[in-house]
Amino acid sequence: FSGGSDEYYFKPGLVWTDLSTGKISFRILPPGAIACSAGPMLYISDEAKRLYLEGYLNSIVADRYVKLLCVTLHFQWGDIAKFPVIYNKDNENNVSLLVEDNNVLSKEDWDSFETSWDFTRHPFIKAITKYPNMMDVGNIYLAECYDIWAGECEERFEKLKDNEEELNRIFIDIYGLQDELTPEVEDKDVTVRRADLGRDVRSFISYAVGCMFGRYSPTYDGLAYAGGTWDDSKYNIYKPDADGIIPICDDEYFEDDLSLIHISE
């Protein structure tokens, strides 16, 4: 593997943050990016080896070398290159499968909120589409959607934690550190989020405001409108505000007042 050379521009690799007061984390970066000093990258041409290295570098074994070799707040390329790598062919497939699963779980979590470029719809809305029988009872309550989302978050959290502990166990055995390290992962070190009522309801309000102004549509994945040509076919269930202004008044002055349209007594 190599890093920094222009021959590796736009190729997939492993990226990490150079400066941090917390634990280092290595992530897969898809094709199309260029490394920089603030976000160095490792480029590995073989996908299986890339996944294997991602599993190793995020394990408790590599964390031991981080503490030994990275003695400042910087995680520099030269220090990472000094990490001893034992490539165990017998465990290659198992490690790759676990790491691939972790990548999927982590991306599912990240894509659940508007900060992701691949955000589609709010998870509360997705809960309705996943369980269409909810529509049969007529009213759909926010509490039910949140409960479904909370269950999915907990399942994802526990699965990722189990996978990380299994990867720790594999690399502890490979490096013969059974007497030095244990595979357990603390909850605070699991990077996917558990459900949080306050945070998740606020994110839903943000999404709802986006729907009111046409940025999103409950039946359309991703951005429904971000400039350009307006496509009314994307809003077949919920129509956004016509003039892009939603008044909120004490009395009923306007027919499109927020309290009249969206808040039932």
Q: In which residue ranges do the predicted regions lie?
A:
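Hydrophobic alpha-helical scaffolding
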Residues: 2-6, 14, 28, 32, ...
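Low-complexity, flexible helical/coil segments
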Residues: 2-3, 11, 50-55, 76-81, ...
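Unusually extended, aromatic-enriched hydrophobic runs near protein termini
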Residues: 1, 5, 13, 22, ...
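Basic, amphipathic alpha-helical recognition segments used for DNA target recognition
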Residues: 7-10, 17-82, 96-101, 105
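Flexible, glycine/threonine-enriched loop-and-boundary segments that flank and lead into catalytic domains
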Residues: 1-31, 174-176, 183-199
